[in-house]
UniProtKB/Swiss-Prot annotation:
Biological function: Catalyzes the reversible phosphorylation of UMP to UDP.
NCBIfam families: pyrH_arch
Annotated positions binding UMP: G43, D65, F113, Q114, P115, G116, Q117, S118, T119
GO MF annotations in UniProt: ATP binding; UMP kinase activity
The protein's assembly and partners: Homohexamer.
EC number(s) from the headed UniProt entry: 2.7.4.22
HAMAP family in UniProt: PyrH_A (MF_01220_A)
Free-text activity regulation comment from the record: Inhibited by UTP.
Enzyme kind, highest EC tier: transferase
Compartment(s) of residence: Cytoplasm
Keywords attached to this entry: ATP-binding, Cytoplasm, Kinase, Nucleotide-binding, Pyrimidine biosynthesis, Transferase
GO cellular component terms listed in the entry, alphabetical order: cytoplasm
Organism: Saccharolobus islandicus (strain L.S.2.15 / Lassen #1)
Protein name, entry field: Uridylate kinase
Amino acid sequence: MNIILKISGKFFDEDNVNNLIVLRESIRELTDNGFRVGIVTGGGSTARRYIKLAREIGIGEAYLDLLGIWASRLNAYLVMFSLQDLAYMHVPQSLEEFIQDWSHGKVVVTGGFQPGQSTAAVAALVAEASSSKTLVVATNVDGVYEKDPRVYTDVKLIPHLTTQDLRKILEGSQSVQAGTYELLDPLAIKIVERSKIRVVVMNYRKLNRIINILKGEEVSSIIEPT
């Protein structure tokens, strides 16, 4: 079974070596249980810091996107090196390169591909290209909520929803500026819909329980394509 794991840039913002150790062991557990795994990394605070500085001196959005892409690739290299023998030792810079790397049978780790495209969209694209029917989005909350649980306290997790439900929740909260993408952007949603890819949103602090989460035995949100 093929699976793509999208790791939020916030995972790297914590500067926590234990996060990387748990990620490595979780990927090893997945591969030992017959999963083919691809990983897409976000840019996190490294991307935002460079984008902020560049924007303040008047650099255009396309170039800001490039800074974000290279930050996400730096995180991809960190994950790739930490996986050691599990990973194919190349970070692809395009969908074509991902497909070629995927053919070698090892874990492929990538960051962004091109300006104007979030790493969530990249994750959806590589899920489609690898015939993965599940895309796992690992972020710093347990799943999808009606409102941001990091801001509001009176919110409940939505365990099951459709991509149409997600659109309504995200309506008005998405930005197309470099460094501001959250969860799934409209392009990512369209891709998972056209290829009928199930999305599981989980907390990256629970990666050690990812198999249980995939079985629906742990807290997460499952987004079904419509």
